[in-house]
Design a protein with these regions (language model features):
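Glycine- and acidic-residue-biased ligand/ion/polar-headgroup-sensing regions
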Residues: 75-88, 92, 197-214
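Conserved short histidine dyad/triad with adjacent acidic residue
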Residues: 37-46, 55-74, 165-168, 180-196, ...
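Asparagine-centered strand-capping/turn motif at beta-strand->loop junctions
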Residues: 114-118
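Surface-exposed interaction/gating patches
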Residues: 144-200, 205-211, 218
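A short, N-terminal "cap"/entry segment at the start of jelly-roll beta-barrel domains
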Residues: 1-53, 119-176
Length: 233
């Protein structure tokens, strides 16, 4: 169609990777132990020459599917972000319904369960990272919220066209990972080349953009995923 990006966009380099939505087909799905009626696409995972610090998956959970033992690594913390359907998250003896935009932070060692108790497909992102403990700092608390309940922070020198929805206070050093929603209005430009210590995974929720990654310009659209090595401009 006239709206389809036509360039051959899948690329894997030492500094970044672009995984277009068109590569996420039925034949490349994976499965996890203790998850019923669930399949996933592994967008990144710790691997030499690739993501070093985190894993990111897109999971599809069919009606009545889910897991009562989702996390098998007691050192792993996790973030859930729902993009379609509704998830029932059980944690600390309470049930929470996560709808699109729903966010949950789950500290390491926390027992939780997730089910799709609806008759519709559930799709969500699961980001996992081994927690780096620091003596004198407690584990972070569970956070359950929705992006609609958070006021985005407008970034400086962008005429209000670039904003970031932060689920965690950047000054809370109990957290060693952050998942945010970044919004660009039409015509918005990042006014400098970002170069910093944070390794990135970026999933395009909606819209289209042109990104400068290292020395290359790449086109991305809704459903595409990018991984950026630490310090990659």
């Amino acid at each position: 169609g006239q709206e389809q990006l036509l360039t051959d966009r899948a690329v894997f380099t030492d500094a970044y990777a672009v995984i277009p939505k068109g590569t996420m087909r039925d034949i490349v799905t994976s499965f996890l132990p203790f998850w019923d009626d669930t399949r996933l696409w592994v967008l990144s995972r710790p691997l030499s020459g690739f993501a070093e610090t985190f894993s990111q998956y897109i999971l599809e959970v069919a009606p009545n599917g889910g897991s009562d033992r989702p996390e098998t690594d007691p050192q792993a913390q996790g973030v859930l972000f729902v993009v379609e359907g509704a998830a029932t998250l059980s944690v600390d003896g309470a049930e929470h319904t996560l709808t699109p935009g729903g966010y949950a932070y789950l500290p390491p060692g926390k027992k939780w369960a997730l089910r799709n108790n609806t008759d519709k497909m559930l799709r969500f992102h699961w980001i996992r990272k081994s927690y780096e403990a620091v003596e004198g700092l407690d584990l972070p608390d569970v956070i359950i919220t929705n992006e609609q309940d958070i006021t985005p922070t407008v970034m400086p020198d962008t005429e209000g066209k670039w904003a970031t929805t932060r689920f965690v206070d950047p000054s809370d050093l109990r957290h060693d990972m952050h998942v945010t929603v970044v919004t660009f209005e039409p015509g918005a430009v990042i006014p400098f080349l970002e170069t910093h210590v944070m390794e990135h995974g970026l999933y395009v929720l909606e819209g289209k953009a042109a990104y400068r990654l290292n020395q290359d310009w790449v086109e991305v659209e809704a459903g595409d995923y990018m991984w950026l090595r630490a310090f990659c401009p």
